[in-house]
Structure formats: structure tokens, C-alpha cells
Amino acid sequence: MCFCVIKVPSCIIYFTNLKVLQLCGIIFNIDASPRIHLPVLKKFDTKNCSWLNAHDDVTIDAPLLESVLIEQDRNSVFRKPRSCQIKFSASCIKEFTYRSLGGISQPIVLSNSSAARNASVNIILNKDGCESYVQETESCAFILLKQFREVKCIKFDASEVLTQPNVAILPKFAMLSHLELGCVSDVVLLRLLQKSSVLNTVLFKVPRLSKFNQELLNSAVVPDCLTSTLQVVKFENVRGSKHELFLAKYFMENGMVLERMSFSCVSWCNKDLIEEFKEKLYSFKNGVSFAILEFRF
């Protein structure tokens, strides 16, 4: 269903045989808090949809739900009144993706964090030329991320929206083994590592720090994952910058069980700069790390 306005009745709604729900460009006008029962739904997929109500929320009751994909463009993110909270009541989510241009203006909650225990989580936020994200992004991103404390894989390409106070009160990610990050500050990176004690793989899609304090990272207590579980560190879109060099050096010096570190360089990067970058890395590696260094151009 695409591009229309639907008035949602204030009652319990049943779709007893629906297994796949795909909606595009729908504006739902809501008078009260509807509860939508979808007993056999497996896939919930919406693009540029808005659930307009200033006070109430929408509950999606789908016990068999496996896949959630929510995509928003700038118009749907900045639309007023803001979209109300969506609550998923499910028990076996395997894949959750939220992708938007402009941030998050819509709180998304799970009735039970264990519902996503086996999920792969992908959260991607882009500014799309905007000077800043929509105002609610910081709080909504925090609410969304903290609910996935039991998952094994998180891809979070929106790390710059997290603040130090928010990261400090995030729960521990006791099962997290794979973490992918976009641009991130030194403090946020350190806190995420400290809260992920069994982390096996870290991938930096944009390997630079939005805030750079070498003394802070060097003086902080080394996260447990670096001394016991972290085996693979990957850097994508490498340009040979000092931030990338420092991050690599930090992991080589502190990664006691590190086995492999890979670098995927941008195609247009100066070859001489990359060769200099490689030489410095190998000089750090000598006597410090037994990890294999890999380069792709």
C-alpha cells in the first residue's frame, strides 16, 4: 500500500492471516492508542510512514515477527505533529533495521528486550545535507539502542548522536560479539568497548574520531574485551589520517588476543600517503602485537 492518509479507529484491530506487511508513504491519523493484532506476521516493512498523534502510542502485537525494517526520509522525519511511539510486542525478532535521513523523531520500543536476543541490529542515521538531526534524535536513538542489550550483532552508523551521559547509563551488552560503528567520539568508543565484555569483532566504517583525545584513551582502564576476546579489527574507507593511525595503534598495543587487523583504503587516496601509513603501522606492531595486518585498495 502506498501514498495515502488513513484514519485509524480507536479499537483493537485484527489481521489474522497477514504474514508480510509493506507500507510506503502512509500517514496514519490516530485518535487514541490502537492495538494491532497480527498473529502470523513475519515481516514488518515501512517506508516514509507517519503515525500522527501527539500523546498516544501504537502497539504492534506480532508474536511471530522476525524482520522489522523502518525507513524514513527527511519529510517524514520532520513532519509535525511528530509520529507517536511504536511498540512491538514480539518474541523472536531476527533482524531489525532503522534507516533514516535526518535522525529519529519516533520512539520505538520493544515490549521485552529478550525478543531480539538473536537479532542482527542495523541503525543508520544520515543528516542528508541538514545542519543537524531532528531534535528528538538523541533521546530516541538512546531509547532504541539500550533495548538491544542482549543481541550478538549491532551495526550502529549513528554513533555521533550518542552523548557521554547517555552512553554512561547504557546497559552492558553481555552477548555482543560483533560491533560496527560510524564516526564516533573517543569517549563514546571507550564506553561502548567497556560495556561489551565478549566482543570478538569491531568494524569502523568511518575510522575517524569526532573528538580526539589521545591522553584520555591511553590513560583509561583497558576494556576487558581487548584483553580477553577481541580478535578482529577492521577499518573501512581508510585515508591514512592520524585518527586512523592512532586507533590502529591503540588496538595493537592493548589487544592481547588480537589476531587480525584489516584496512580497506578509499580508491582515490594518495598511494604514497598509504605507504607511509603502512610503515608506521608495522613500526608500532614490532614487539607489541602478533596480529596479521591486511590491506585492500
Language model segments and positions:
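Basic, glycine-rich polyanion-binding accessory segments appended to enzymes
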Residues: 226
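Hydrophobic, well-ordered secondary-structure elements that form the walls
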Residues: 192, 233, 251
